[in-house]
């Protein structure tokens, strides 16, 4: 069994201010340790949530496993460092979440020797107490006995998606007037957020991203859950070359209405790129109430008042109902 040399981190917390809700990074100092073989989930090397860890793959069949358990919700950033070489060989780095007896793949990244010496992997929207694994294996043979370094950084915050949030039942809860950061970790990843309206009014949604001259991007779909059905309200394609702040069609919300925002791929080049989803709520009785696409579900229109609406898609219809009141005699 080969020896494993890596650098572990003794974490020391630096609190930035005392404001509730501010993300608090955790900083650390380095300590060197020797660890025996870590070629399975059961023998995975335990990593602190902040640190720098170096190792090598001893042969073409060698695999290295690492395990992390965050002590709070937040963002787990992972960087993979190596020395440049003029070769297409390298490493395959896979991240997993252990949940309900299964190892759920979050991301799978191939890093070649000729790639940048510091590669940022898709971040993990981590949950307190959950177990996460990093698996490193060879991508062809030239990376054998070449040192790599895994660096992890953890930011405590409630404003990050919580993987796995790829279904309605596991959606990340998004409070009113809040901002969340997420990323699509792989080609099949889906991120779903749930919003419960605190009253009648307008839920304005913006999708923010970093500009790139690229036609790939994200597909953002908004649903209302009512009567056991998920009713599509809008469906938008946002390319990386679109405006960095993209205004989605707003939701004409009803009190205690349940709404979902679903984010999927539009082609694949945006894998691992961060996006920001922001909602702003304006309570008011003078916005349409979706779904109001039939006579039966028409929004009541009060005489003498100004009401606002929007057509969220090519198929959207808005119905308004006016009830004539008899004059007093």
Question: What residue spans do the PLM features occupy?
Answer:
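Non-catalytic, beta-strand-enriched accessory regions in extracellular/secretory proteins
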Residues: 51-75, 117-121, 133, 178-202, ...
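Positively charged n-region of N-terminal signal peptides that target proteins for export
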Residues: 1-5
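Hydrophobic core
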Residues: 10, 14-18
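Asp/Glu-rich intrinsically disordered low-complexity tracts
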Residues: 46, 62, 73, 100-105, ...
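Surface-exposed beta-strand/loop patches in noncatalytic accessory domains
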Residues: 55-56, 83-117, 139, 152, ...
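A short beta-strand element within beta-rich, extracytoplasmic domains
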Residues: 75-84, 202-211, 329
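Sec-dependent signal peptide cleavage junction
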Residues: 18-33
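C-terminal edge strands of extracellular/lumenal beta-sandwich accessory domains
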Residues: 29-47, 66, 85, 93-103, ...
């Amino acid at each position: 069994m080969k020896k494993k040399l890596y650098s572990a981190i003794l974490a020391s917390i630096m609190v930035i201010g005392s404001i509730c809700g501010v993300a608090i990074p955790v900083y650390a100092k380095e300590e060197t340790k020797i660890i025996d073989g870590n070629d399975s989930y059961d023998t995975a090397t335990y990593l602190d949530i902040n640190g720098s860890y170096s190792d090598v793959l001893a042969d073409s069949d060698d695999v290295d496993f690492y395990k992390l358990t965050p002590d709070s919700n937040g963002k787990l950033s992972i960087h993979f460092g190596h020395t440049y070489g003029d070769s297409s060989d390298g490493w395959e780095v896979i991240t997993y979440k252990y949940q309900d007896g299964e190892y759920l793949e979050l991301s799978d990244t191939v890093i070649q020797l000729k790639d940048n010496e510091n590669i940022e992997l898709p971040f993990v929207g981590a949950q307190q107490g959950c177990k996460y694994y990093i698996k490193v294996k060879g991508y062809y043979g030239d990376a054998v006995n070449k040192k790599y370094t895994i660096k992890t950084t953890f930011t405590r915050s409630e404003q990050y998606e919580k993987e796995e949030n790829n279904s309605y039942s596991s959606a990340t809860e998004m409070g009113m007037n809040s901002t969340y950061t997420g990323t699509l970790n792989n080609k099949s990843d889906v991120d779903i957020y749930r919003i419960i309206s605190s009253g009648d009014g307008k839920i304005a949604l913006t999708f923010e991203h970093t500009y790139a001259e690229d036609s790939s991007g994200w597909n953002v779909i908004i649903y209302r859950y009512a009567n056991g059905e998920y009713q599509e309200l809008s469906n938008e394609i946002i390319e990386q070359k679109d405006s960095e702040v993209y205004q989605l069609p707003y939701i004409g919300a009803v009190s205690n209405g349940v709404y979902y925002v679903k984010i999927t791929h539009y082609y694949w080049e945006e894998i691992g790129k961060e996006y920001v989803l922001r909602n702003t709520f304006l309570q008011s009785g003078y916005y349409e109430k979706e779904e109001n696409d039939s006579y039966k579900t028409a929004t009541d229109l009060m005489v003498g008042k100004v009401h606002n609406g929007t057509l969220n898609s090519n198929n959207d219809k808005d119905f308004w109902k006016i009830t004539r009141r008899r004059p007093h005699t």
